[in-house]
C-alpha cells in the first residue's frame, strides 16, 4: 500500500519537512521533495530514512497506462476470395462490412487502393 507523508521529525535535518511516498509492500520510499541529500524521484529503502516521525497526507494515486509498444488487432472473419470477388463484383456485396482501425466500414465504400490495402493487410502468409 502506498501512503504519502511529510516528515516532521528526523535525526537527519535534510529530511525535516520533506515529502515522500512510502510503499509498504516493497519497503521503499520515493522522494517527492527534500531540502538536500535526496533527489526528486529517488527511491530508497524505508529504513534508510532512519528514525522519523511524520504526518500522513492524502494521496490520489492514479494507475498509469503505457501506450507505447501496444498492439492493435482487427478481426475480420472471411475468406480472401470473398474480398477479391467484392472488388470485382461490388453489386453482389452491398452489405459487406469489415473492421478497419477499430471502426466498421462497408467494403464497397473504400477506394480501390484502400480495398487492396485491406486485402494485403488481412491475409498474410505468416506472422
Curated annotation (Swiss-Prot):
Acts as a radical domain for damaged PFL and possibly other radical proteins. Residues 5-127 form the Glycine radical domain. It comes from the Bacteria. GO terms for molecular function: formate C-acetyltransferase activity. This is Autonomous glycyl radical cofactor. The modification Glycine radical is found at residue 102. InterPro entries: Auton_GlycylRad_Cofactor (IPR050244), Form_AcTrfase_GR_CS (IPR019777), Gly_radical (IPR001150), Glycyl_radical_cofactor_GrcA (IPR011140). It comes from Mannheimia succiniciproducens (strain KCTC 0769BP / MBEL55E). GO terms for cellular component: cytosol. HAMAP family: GrcA. The keyword Chaperone does not apply. PROSITE patterns: GLY_RADICAL_1, GLY_RADICAL_2. Keywords: Organic radical.
Amino acid at each position: 500500500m502506498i501512503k504519502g507523508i511529510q516528515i516532521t521529525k528526523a535525526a537527519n535535518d535534510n529530511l525535516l519537512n520533506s515529502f515522500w511516498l512510502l510503499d509498504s509492500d516493497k519497503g521503499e520510499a520515493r522522494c517527492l521533495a527534500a531540502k538536500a541529500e535526496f533527489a526528486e524521484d529517488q527511491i530508497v529503502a524505508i529504513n534508510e530514512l532512519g528514525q522519523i516521525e511524520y504526518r500522513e497526507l492524502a494521496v490520489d494515486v492514479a494507475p498509469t497506462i503505457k501506450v507505447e509498444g501496444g498492439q492493435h488487432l482487427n478481426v475480420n472473419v472471411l475468406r480472401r476470395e470473398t474480398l477479391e470477388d467484392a472488388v470485382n463484383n461490388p453489386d453482389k456485396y452491398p452489405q459487406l462490412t469489415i473492421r478497419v482501425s477499430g471502426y466498421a466500414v462497408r467494403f464497397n465504400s473504400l477506394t480501390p487502393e484502400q480495398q487492396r490495402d485491406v486485402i494485403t493487410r488481412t491475409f498474410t502468409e505468416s506472422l
